[in-house]
Amino acid sequence: MTIKFLSESTINRIAAGEVIERPASVVKELVENAVDASSTKIDIILERAGKNLIIISDDGIGMTDKELEIAVERHTTSKFDESDFLNINTFGFRGEALPSIAAISKMLITSKKRDADKAFQIKLIGGNEKQVTISVHNEGTKIEIRDLFFATPARLKFLRADKTELTATVDVVKKIALAHPKISFSLTHDGKNLLKLKGQNKDAETNLKQRIIDVIGDDFIKNAAYIDFKTPDFSICGYTSSPTYNRASSEDQFLFINNRPVKDKLLQVALRVAYQDYLARDRYPICAIFLQIDPQLVDVNVHPAKAEVRFHDPNYVRNLLIEAIKNALTNKSHVTSTTIASDVLELFKNPLVNKQSPVSKVINVNSKSADYRPTTHSTLNTVPQNHVCQKLIDTLSHAKIEQEVENRIEHEQQTRKQYKLGAAKAQLHTTYIISQTEDSIVITDQHAAHERLGYEKIKDYLKTEELIKQRLLIPEIVELPNEKKADCLYDHREKLYKLGLTLEKFGEKSIIVTEIPNILGDVNVQKLIQDLADHLSDFGKNIALTELIEHVTETYACHYSIRAGRKLSADEMNALLRQMENTPLSGQCNHGRPTYIELKLKDIERLFGR
């Protein structure tokens, strides 16, 4: 076969194959064009999820008859100066979208330039039969796409069910709407309105907050930390969820570069690293984060759909994003998810409903540490005992009160007013601390709370020095289930030594331990080594030092913490509460589970119909 030139229509169909995968791709390209046209209102109408009909209407600057003719040709654009290719601020710039869409559909464009006397219309079928006529239309542009992929039936066969395609389109519109809170958006499918977002005209932070409430939900804002981070050539703003408000997938993570929605691996990894101290590995935070960067420091022309970008200095961007998120979470302090109390109240109302707890939608109740009950001796006596109340040796066992609280004194009342977690009143099942504030009761999981405190304490030690070791009077021999786990620990023995653990191989499946970190106190060495082996065996020899430290610190913290089932004095309970108040992110343990739940008095009154 001889070499020959492809026809213009064939070239456009090939280009469409790269850019237009489904109806959502068409909506994305056309809505982005409307945004670039300085629109304040964009309406989207779909039939059969866009397979039969897509209509995009805007009130933007519009086009003249000459501009209409040029707009449907390949590589024509009004959006940037080709001499300034490194300074792209618009969504589109390649000039491929309209001709590519026209090549695989029946397209009708009607447009009227602002302050013009006439509107014009152009009709294309499969990219051909271009004819401009005079029409009637308001200022702006309306684009109708019918019978998508009629010219490429093979692509049509690969489309998913209407529901799936519609979900993808709604997701696209939501992302663009989040980035442009001043623009009004509406989305109608088969006559039913799915989205109606009113444009906001207040200050930037208020506009963004309201648009996030409209798109993601009010619950997210209530359980999110605000990000406001700036450097001379870089700024990050947005919201990211508290660790206890999380999901089982990353679908609710909205990331933007210069208002362009992206699904960039670098940013996703940075987000993961920022939360690694607070979330189990199978849980994901929710976020809407906007990065503004000098266009010359980022290349948006590396992906056909512009979904990925390339940074001039990726490590710099990664580290800044991690720092921005951690700063925001630290400022959120020990606050836990506000939805948890509501879920608990629902459980009270429907105690016999045999279904998954709504709490499990927010937190990871299946994490490895969820049911962990260490048998080690508490090191709680190292906690500062400032501002403690008079001893209240009130213990609740099996949900029945054994002894009423007596001798309420003025100091306790001051404690309730002064401290967010209030004054300890009792202990439930020797596992949960009940405390009282001015307008609520707080239920604290003593093991999860102390595990978080221990985690932060051990991290602080590791930042400045090696952990102090204590030599075991009698070395401990730990037999592991298989040789792989024993080898894994032995392979990391030098790194573990710096983390306070001295061990050697003892036979095929056993490890002999001679020194442990002093901070762990009277720890169960057998359980410690077994848990550590479980953590590390999945990663083998190639685990990075930072990941190794993370796993070891998690394991140490779990064994450092006070056990469920141990009775605490009022002084110990109050000391734990005070230290929680002074520790950032103490509202959740290392796996994203809440360390405490607060029930407001008004919520309790609702339970009793008051």
Curated annotation (Swiss-Prot):
Cystine pairs: none
Record-given protein name: DNA mismatch repair protein MutL
Gene Ontology molecular-function annotations: ATP binding; ATP hydrolysis activity; ATP-dependent DNA damage sensor activity; mismatched DNA binding
Any one of the GO CC terms: mismatch repair complex
Family named by the database record: Belongs to the DNA mismatch repair MutL/HexB family.
Highest rank taxon of the organism: Bacteria
Keywords: DNA damage, DNA repair
Organism: Rickettsia conorii (strain ATCC VR-613 / Malish 7)
CDD domains: HATPase_MutL-MLH-PMS-like, MutL_Trans
GO biological process: mismatch repair
Lineage, top ranks: Bacteria, Pseudomonadati, Pseudomonadota, Alphaproteobacteria, Rickettsiales
Protein's job: This protein is involved in the repair of mismatches in DNA. It is required for dam-dependent methyl-directed DNA mismatch repair. May act as a 'molecular matchmaker', a protein that promotes the formation of a stable complex between two or more DNA-binding proteins in an ATP-dependent manner without itself being part of a final effector complex.
Signal peptide: none
